[in-house]
Amino acid sequence: MLESEFQSQVIDLARLRGWMVMHQRPAQIRTGRWITAVQGDAGFPDLVLARAHHGDLIFAELKKEGGRISPLQKAWIRTLIGTGAEAYIWYPSDLPQIITRLSRSNP
């Protein structure tokens, strides 16, 4: 499964369960060169998911099966967890756990 397919699946699951979804879409500026219009430190997670009435906020980095996390992505996840935030690195094989997490309230 491509990362983009996995991402669409997670976004659809989140929306079906009442989550608001933030995803920064990159734009191709020339062949092989992509940028994101939003500024910030590199490696920020792919998705931010929120459900206000449940008090839920999740940061999720998505990878295709076998995909590698960059040092900057690891740093963001560690930093977010260090603040008490809920942050994950999710792979397609994590789908059962993702469904469970998106279906329940804040742990």
Whereabouts are the PLM-identified features?
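Catalytic phosphate/metal-binding cores of nucleic-acid and nucleotide-processing enzymes, i.e., regions
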Residues: 1-107
